[in-house]
């Protein structure tokens, strides 16, 4: 077996683990596996299940050195009936298996219905081609000994591991043949991505149906129907609706062709208003002329949501709708797609990039631009970059026609304004940025709006912190000791950061760590070995300080147990990695205090008063209304996990079924939720059965379609006035409540200031709406001219690339990685390094999430090879036929060879060196 095959097997092991039950192929692997290894694998399956058994099987498999075992493994898969897995490994193409994931998600969701409605013995013969022979025998045996429901559960387990690409369709046919009612739920023609949650819910006899284009519940516009929402048929879902009067009021200025900001509360149906405007706009063109609409969504989940909404709404009109996001842009000809479609849903950076490249020559190609969450149009946000282009075209006297501009928002905001005049200026500046001459709000149909949008009652709860905090005392002592060790290595530690008077367990301390780490990355000494030793040591000390600081923040807001578990996980990972002398010393110091920390965290007297108050609120609200649906907003992902664990472990809250919703995280970190995971959670939350409380970070603030809830809790969570209005707007049901729970009086004060600013914003909008339109336009033009003058005066000439060769050093240990002369650029944005010398500088490990993107297949992660460093440098990919590393500049320090000056860059675009395109011919040298 070649090294490449071994690496590929490691890279794709997640697919194998999810599919293979190794006990079915062990008999075929007898020539290569020892008897005790076979027993270990069988025991692992019996104790922990097939996935853990597959993990152990792969471990033993990859340790084999005998000739021919890889072919033996493939033959074993073939003989046992794993034809799909065999084909995928033979070609190293797992696309067919990956496509099954959406059906697995659907089956998991429908599992309770499946178990109660399916009689496995009726359909097993029709499904035999989708299952392993041994699986069929086991299912029939379980049906015989334990009953049909247990057999159905086993059938689900087997289908979830099936590698046959046709199993979803085969299951459908088998169900239809038996006239089983479950076939109505099992929709395979389009897959779960295209199946409306509402259809499933309707057939599963739940009553909380959301109309397909729903940004908010009011989008149903079912006021004209006499039947309740649960009785609305599929035909009604996609037929034309009669808009409410307040929606027509919001749409009217835009329908008259005016550039408009539509400012209306979350829950009123702004998405539906945008559909009305778009439809009116496209229909107004005479024969032979056509409009072209672009709708901008700022976040990928919102983009996916709106693309689906527009596609379904306009398919009955014969308009062509498509979408391009950052995830798909590399694989599509943007210019052609824009040219060939009537409505294009975009993430804004796509248009910014293509305007720069010239693939889209100007905004004149569009006739209408709609900006969702348009309050973001400021500073260097992509929305503003698009509007800079628009305003340059407008003020530069370009002959090309400009598109109409529509902005949608729940709150225009007031920035840092302290009075109505300053708020007025801020709003005028936003109008100037969007070239809007009208702010549309509901004035004449307020009563109707108030019947649809329910403003929740707001409550502030100030809770005392723990009276004494032994946990914090112990951790603070460990942090002081760690700081002292760092000062022994670097006596100038205090001078590496301008931040003074830092306090443990605060955001300010986190900022101090960041500035110290940046400073030590460019710290220089004549003795380079000593420089490397000091920089690496400081990096380790500050990394441990960061984890201690995180733990203090978790303890302050959750349980001491959660904070301690966080630290135990960290030190467990430290032991599994390089574990040099410094890490051994720091780990030993922690372990010396571990027993005391365990004792403190178990002491009932150390319960967090904030959690006790949160528990009281939840008990009280669910007692008053057992059907309560809650969103609990928190600041960090770590706190999301901690509060979920607390709820699940609290017998007083056994009535709660928590789900979590967090952002996607950084691409170079294994944190955050994937888009499918976010969608799955939101669908489950809307179903009002799988989860009755959603614990969320700020990702739930803005734009994402979240079902009605009647309780919003802001747990130490506050932002600006826009964030306040959006989070409060999540409480959409009649009689909803919003609690702000905090131990910090300053948080309550900030929220009260936000409430004052909201009133100031509303008053300012009312004042603006009384202005003469010509006067307002003149004001807007003055701001635009002034802002363009400032922009032009600040415009910098395009930097000249530096042709001098430079070193790239590992940011953690300062080891030489490569020279810029060896760096090559692929497709203008990916950076690889040529030459065998660089290969000796890194080690590879299987990527936890291998996947295909554009012309690349992500296979492994690469790390600094220097002993006890292992700093993350990037990834190893297959590009066309080449196996190459792809590095990220944020992992390196750039050193000028001539002067020795060291510089940090967070993005390649900021590093102006001579960028040589990748040439395949160089790979053969």
From Swiss-Prot:
Q: What is the effect of changing residue 154 to R?
A: Reduction of ubiquitination. Reduction of INFB induction
Q: What range(s) does the Helicase C-terminal domain occupy?
A: 610-776
State the protein's purpose. Innate immune receptor that senses cytoplasmic viral nucleic acids and activates a downstream signaling cascade leading to the production of type I interferons and pro-inflammatory cytokines. Forms a ribonucleoprotein complex with viral RNAs on which it homooligomerizes to form filaments. The homooligomerization allows the recruitment of RNF135 an E3 ubiquitin-protein ligase that activates and amplifies the RIG-I-mediated antiviral signaling in an RNA length-dependent manner through ubiquitination-dependent and -independent mechanisms.
Tell me, what is an example of a GO biological process annotation in this record? detection of virus
- Give the organism, scientific name: Homo sapiens
Q: EC number(s)?
A: 3.6.4.13
Cross-link Glycyl lysine isopeptide (Lys-Gly) (interchain with G-Cter in ubiquitin): give the residues: 48, 96, 154, 164, 172, 181, 193, 203, 812
Outcome reported for the amino acid change (mutating residue 270 to A): No IRF3 signaling activity. Loss of dsRNA-induced ATPase activity. No effect on ds-RNA binding. Changed RIG-I signaling pathway
InterPro entries this protein is in? CARD_dom, CARD_RIG-I_r2, DEAD/DEAH_box_helicase_dom, DEATH-like_dom_sf, Helicase_ATP-bd, Helicase_C-like, P-loop_NTPase, RIG-I-like_C
Helicase ATP-binding domain: which residues?
A: 251-430
Name the principal localization, coarsely classed: cytoplasm
Cite the CARD domain residue spans from the record: 1-87, 92-172
Encoding gene (name): RIGI
User: What molecular functions are annotated in GO for this chain?
Assistant: ATP binding; ATP hydrolysis activity; double-stranded DNA binding; double-stranded RNA binding; GTP binding; identical protein binding; pattern recognition receptor activity; RNA helicase activity
Which is one Pfam family of this protein?
RIG-I_C-RD
Q: Which residues carry this modification: (Microbial infection) Deamidated asparagine?
A: 495, 549
Q: Where in the cell is it found?
A: Cytoplasm; Cell projection, Ruffle membrane; Cytoplasm, Cytoskeleton; Cell junction, Tight junction
Q: Region (Interaction with ZC3HAV1) spans which residues?
A: 218-925
**Positions bearing Phosphoserine:** 8, 854-855
Positions annotated to bind ATP:
264-271
Put simply, this protein is called Antiviral innate immune response receptor RIG-I
Enzyme class, spelled out: hydrolase
UniProt effect for mutating residue 849 to R: Decreased ubiquitination and function in RIG-I signaling pathway without effect on RNA-binding
The sequence motif named DECH box is recorded at 372-375
Modification type Phosphothreonine: residues? 170, 770
An example of a Gene Ontology cellular component annotation for this protein is: cytoplasm
């Amino acid at each position: 077996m070649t090294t490449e095959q071994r690496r590929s097997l490691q890279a794709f092991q997640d697919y194998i683990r999810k599919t293979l039950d190794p006990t079915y192929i062990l008999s075929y692997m007898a020539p290569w596996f020892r008897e005790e290894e076979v027993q270990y694998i069988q025991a692992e399956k019996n104790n922990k299940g097939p996935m853990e058994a597959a993990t152990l099987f792969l471990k033993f498999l990859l340790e084999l050195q005998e000739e021919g075992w890889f072919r033996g493994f493939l033959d074993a898969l073939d003989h046992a009936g794993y034809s799909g897995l065999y084909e995928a490994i033979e070609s190293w193409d797992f696309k067919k298996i990956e496509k099954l994931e959406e059906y697995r998600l659907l089956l998991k969701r429908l599992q309770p219905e499946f178990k109660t409605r399916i009689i496995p013995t009726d359909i097993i013969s029709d499904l035999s081609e989708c299952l392993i022979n041994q699986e069929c025998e086991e299912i029939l045996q379980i049906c015989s000994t334990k009953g049909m429901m247990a057999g159905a559960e086993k059938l689900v387990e087997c289908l979830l591991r099936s590698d046959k690409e046709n199993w979803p369709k085969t299951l459908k046919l088998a169900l239809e043949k038996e006239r089983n009612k479950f076939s109505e739920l099992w929709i395979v023609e389009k897959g779960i991505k295209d199946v409306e949650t509402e259809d499933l819910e309707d057939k599963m006899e739940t009553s909380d149906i959301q109309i397909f284009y729903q940004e908010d519940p009011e989008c149903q516009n079912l006021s004209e129907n006499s039947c309740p929402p649960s009785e609305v048929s599929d035909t009604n879902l996609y037929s034309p609706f009669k808009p409410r009067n307040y929606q027509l009021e919001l749409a009217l200025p835009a329908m008259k062709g005016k550039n408009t900001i539509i400012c209306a509360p979350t829950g009123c149906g702004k998405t539906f208003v945008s559909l009305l405007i778009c439809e009116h706009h496209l229909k107004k063109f005479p024969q032979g002329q056509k409009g072209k609409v672009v709708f901008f969504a700022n976040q990928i989940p919102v983009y996916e949501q709106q693309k689906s909404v527009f596609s379904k709404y306009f398919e009955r009109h014969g308009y062509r709708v498509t979408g391009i996001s950052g995830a798909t842009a590399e694989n599509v000809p943007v210019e052609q797609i824009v040219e060939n479609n009537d409505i294009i849903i975009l993430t804004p950076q796509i248009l910014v990039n293509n305007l720069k490249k010239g693939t889209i020559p100007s905004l004149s190609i569009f006739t209408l631009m709609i900006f969702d969450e348009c309050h973001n149009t400021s500073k260097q946000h992509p929305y503003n970059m698009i509007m800079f282009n628009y305003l340059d075209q407008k003020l530069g006297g370009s002959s090309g026609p400009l598109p109409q501009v529509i902005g949608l928002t729940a709150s225009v905001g007031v920035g840092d304004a302290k009075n109505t005049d300053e708020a007025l200026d801020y709003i005028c500046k936003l109008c100037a940025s969007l070239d809007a001459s009208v702010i549309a709000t509901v004035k004449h149909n307020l009563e109707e709006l108030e019947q649809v949008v329910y403003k929740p009652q707001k409550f502030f709860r100030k809770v005392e912190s723990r009276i004494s905090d032994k946990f914090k005392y112990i951790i603070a002592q460990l942090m002081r000791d760690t700081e002292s060790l760092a000062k022994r290595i670097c006596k100038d530690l205090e001078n590496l950061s301008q931040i003074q008077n830092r306090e443990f367990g605060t955001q300010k301390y986190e900022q101090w760590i960041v500035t110290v780490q940046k400073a030590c990355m460019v710290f220089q000494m004549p003795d380079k070995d000593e420089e490397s030793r000091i920089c690496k040591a400081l990096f380790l000390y500050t990394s441990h300080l960061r984890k201690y600081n995180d733990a203090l923040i978790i303890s302050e807001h959750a349980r001491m147990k959660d904070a301690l578990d966080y630290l135990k996980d960290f030190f467990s990972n430290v032991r599994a990695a390089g574990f040099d002398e410094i890490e051994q010393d720091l780990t030993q110091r922690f372990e010396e205090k571990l027993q005391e920390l365990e004792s403190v965290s178990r002491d009932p007297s150390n319960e967090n008063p904030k959690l006790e108050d949160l528990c009281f609120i939840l008990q009280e609200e669910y007692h008053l209304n057992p059907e309560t649906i809650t969103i609990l907003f928190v600041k960090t992902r770590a706190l999301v996990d901690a509060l979920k664990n607390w709820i699940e472990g609290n017998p007083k809250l056994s009535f709660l079924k928590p789900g979590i919703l967090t952002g996607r995280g950084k691409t170079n970190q294994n944190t955050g939720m994937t888009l499918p995971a976010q969608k799955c959670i939101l669908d489950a939350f809307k179903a009002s059965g799988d989860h009755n409380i959603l614990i969320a970070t700020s990702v739930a603030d803005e734009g994402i379609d979240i079902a009605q809830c009647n309780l919003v809790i802001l747990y130490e969570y506050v932002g600006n006035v826009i964030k306040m209005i959006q989070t409060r707007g999540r409480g959409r049901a009649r009689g909803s409540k919003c609690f702000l729970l905090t131990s910090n009086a300053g948080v309550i004060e900030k929220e009260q200031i936000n409430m004052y600013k909201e009133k100031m914003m509303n008053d300012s909008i009312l004042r603006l709406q009384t202005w003469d339109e010509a006067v307002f336009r003149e004001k807007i033009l003055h701001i635009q001219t002034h802002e363009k003058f400032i922009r032009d005066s600040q415009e910098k000439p395009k930097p000249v690339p530096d042709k001098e060769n430079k070193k790239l050093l590992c940011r953690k240990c300062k080891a030489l990685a490569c020279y810029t002369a060896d760096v090559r650029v692929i497709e203008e944005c990916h950076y690889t390094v040529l030459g065998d010398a660089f290969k000796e500088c890194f080690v590879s490990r299987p990527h936890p999430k291998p996947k295909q993107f554009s012309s690349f297949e992500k296979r492994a992660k690469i790390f600094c090879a220097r002993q006890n460093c292992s700093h993350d440098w990037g990834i190893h990919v297959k590009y066309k036929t080449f196996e190459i590393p792809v590095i990220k500049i944020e992992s390196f320090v750039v050193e000028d060879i001539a002067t020795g000056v060291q510089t940090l860059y967070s993005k390649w675009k900021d590093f102006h060196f001579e960028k040589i395109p990748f040439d395949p011919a160089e790979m053969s040298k």
